[in-house]
Every structure is written in C-alpha cells, then in structure tokens.
C-alpha cells in the first residue's frame, strides 16, 4: 500500500521563504519544497523572477492536521507583517503519493557552476567537465542544501579564492599548500567536499543534526573525500586544535553566540568565513566579532544575504 502525504502550501514573499521553510521543517520533521523550485536547488537567476513563492511542507496523510494548520497560520500572522508585499492567505492542503513527493523535486536540480572552477552536479545528471573544472557530486536529499543557495554559494566562491590566492585573499594567485579546514554546520557536506577537492589535507565537519551528518558522509563518499574528512555531531567547543580556514554557514545570532569559539578555532594568520547572514544583520555580526584581533577583508552580498571574510592577526 502506498503511503499518502498531506501537502500544505503557503504563499509568501521571496524574502520570507527561508524563515518559513525553517519553521515548516521543524514543525513537520520533513523536507520542504518551493513552487517550481526545490529548496536550495534553484538557479540563481530565478530568485527575483516572482515577488512571491509557494512553500510546501509534507505531513503524514493519516493524521489530523488541525494543530499544524493552526500553528502555521499563527506563524504567518506573527511574522508576515515584517515582509514587504505580504498578504495573508490560508494554507492549502492537498494529498499526494509518497513517490511523487520523494522524486519530483529532483527535476529542478541541475549542474551549476560556482566561481571559476567549481561545478556542482546531482548524481543522476551527466556533466562533461571542461578543462580546469572541479566537479562536486551531490545527492542532498530533500532537507539539505545543494550549494546553489546564496549563503552556500558565496562560501564556495570565497573558499576557491582562498585556495587560489585571489582577490583580497593573498592576492598573489598562487595555490595554497595543503591546509586544514573546519566546516561548522556542514549540512550536505558540500563545503567540505569542495575543500577536499581544492587541496585541503585535513577537514573537520560538524553539524548538530545527526541526519545531516549521515547525508554529508554519503556525499563525501561519493566524492572519494571521506578519508580526508572527520564528520560528526561534535559540539564546536569540543573540537580540538586550530584551523587555517574556518567556515560557518549558520544563522547570524548563532554566529555571534559562537564568536569566541569560532575565533579560538582559527589559526593565527588564518581565515574565518561567515555566511547565513541576512544583509540587515551584517553590522550586528561584524560588531559581534569585534575585539578578537580579526581584520574584515571582504563583504560579499547576494540577494538579501551577506558573507563576511575575516583574517586573524598573526601572533
């Protein structure tokens, strides 16, 4: 017997998509999708095509949905007014078969180039690599990112620039010798995979979500990167040592809360790359990392998101 799922759809402004998606993932315990786009798998050119998107969450179709619908409507009323163009609409409920929910999102995940060299491709898509391409194979599952979201994309761009000494990162165009990398909030593992393929000699990847760790391990194995990466649910304060590059793609409030530990894990002269920051909270994060001996060397922005690149003073 095929499992039936209840699909609850909510129409919101583009800027509210991430906030609502996080809430729905927590409420449902499952992945979400966006109309005509799978979460975190869109082509970047489509972000501004429409002022609104339909976010869809999935619940067990055999259980009553009254409490979930009430929670969603309360959330929309509480947060919607903060977003330009928000008009409250009642969520729409539909019933779908499990195989439709599990596979339809894949048709929207295509190979995407990030930076000058990196190409991310799903495992089910063919891609003819060009000269100099560094191909990352990914099978993210519905609840984890693919690298196309601006927060992850900017991290990947900065990571490539660091390894190749481009822009504000050394600026000499020389490839770094093997380095150590700490990936905080690894999710699908895409940043760790990129670091391994760019030449890191040792990588530590952590995430508070055990499911994310499992997905990351599978993706690392797909890319023959698992021997280089220790991935676990270890808390940041329990990670030993210091790293040449520290990457943290998490919410602004968490970045500031973890600022002392993130700086403590950064080697003198090393780079600290922070993403997951709404542009309106950029100064909040910069101020939160003041007084630690960091130099802000780059502010990168895309859509409503910011990525900050710091260098820790050598001692």
Swiss-Prot record:
Subcellular location: Cytoplasm
Keywords: Cytoplasm, Methyltransferase, S-adenosyl-L-methionine, Transferase
Pfam families on file: PrmA
Amino acids binding S-adenosyl-L-methionine: 152, 185, 207, 249
Gene Ontology terms describing biological process: methylation
A GO molecular-function descriptor: protein-lysine N-methyltransferase activity
EC class of the enzyme, as a word: transferase
Annotated EC: 2.1.1.-
Chief location of this protein within or outside the cell: cytoplasm
Gene Ontology CC: one annotated term: cytoplasm
Catalysed reaction equations from the record: L-lysyl-[protein] + 3 S-adenosyl-L-methionine = N(6),N(6),N(6)-trimethyl-L-lysyl-[protein] + 3 S-adenosyl-L-homocysteine + 3 H(+)
NCBIfam families from the UniProt entry: prmA
Record-stated family: Belongs to the methyltransferase superfamily. PrmA family.
Function: Methylates ribosomal protein L11.
Designated name of the protein: Ribosomal protein L11 methyltransferase
Lineage: Bacteria, Pseudomonadati, Thermodesulfobacteriota, Desulfuromonadia, Geobacterales
């Amino acid at each position: 017997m095929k499992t039936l799922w209840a699909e609850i759809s909510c129409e919101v402004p583009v800027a509210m998509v991430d906030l609502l998606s996080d809430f729905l993932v927590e409420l449902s315990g499952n992945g979400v999708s966006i109309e005509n786009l799978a979460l975190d798998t869109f082509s970047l050119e489509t972000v501004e095509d429409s002022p609104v998107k339909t976010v869809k969450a999935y619940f067990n179709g055999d259980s009553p949905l009254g409490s979930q619908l009430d929670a969603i409507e309360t959330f929309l009323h509480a947060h919607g007014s903060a977003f330009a163009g928000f008009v409250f609409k009642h969520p729409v409920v539909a019933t779908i078969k499990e195989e439709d929910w599990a596979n339809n999102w894949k048709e929207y995940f295509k190979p995407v180039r990030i930076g000058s060299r990196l190409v991310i491709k799903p495992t089910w898509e063919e891609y003819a690599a060009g000269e100099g391409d560094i191909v990352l194979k990914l099978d993210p599952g519905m609840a984890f990112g693919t690298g196309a979201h601006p927060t992850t994309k900017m991290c990947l761009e900065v990571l490539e620039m660091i390894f190749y000494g481009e822009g504000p990162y050394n600026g000499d165009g020389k490839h770094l010798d093997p380095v150590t990398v700490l990936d905080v909030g690894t999710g699908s593992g895409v940043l760790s995979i990129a670091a391994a393929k760019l030449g890191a000699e040792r990588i530590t990847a952590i995430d508070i979500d055990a499911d994310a760790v499992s997905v990351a391990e599978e993706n690392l194995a797909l890319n023959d990167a698992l021997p280089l990466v220790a991935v676990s649910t270890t808390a940041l304060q329990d990670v030993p040592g210091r790293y040449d590059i520290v990457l943290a793609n998490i919410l602004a409030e968490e970045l500031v809360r973890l600022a002392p530990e993130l700086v403590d894990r950064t080697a003198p002269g090393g780079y600290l790359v922070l993403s997951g920051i709404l542009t309106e909270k950029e100064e909040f994060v910069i101020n939160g990392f003041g007084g630690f001996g960091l130099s802000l060397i780059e502010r990168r922005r895309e859509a409503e998101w910011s990525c900050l690149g710091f260098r820790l003073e050598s001692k």
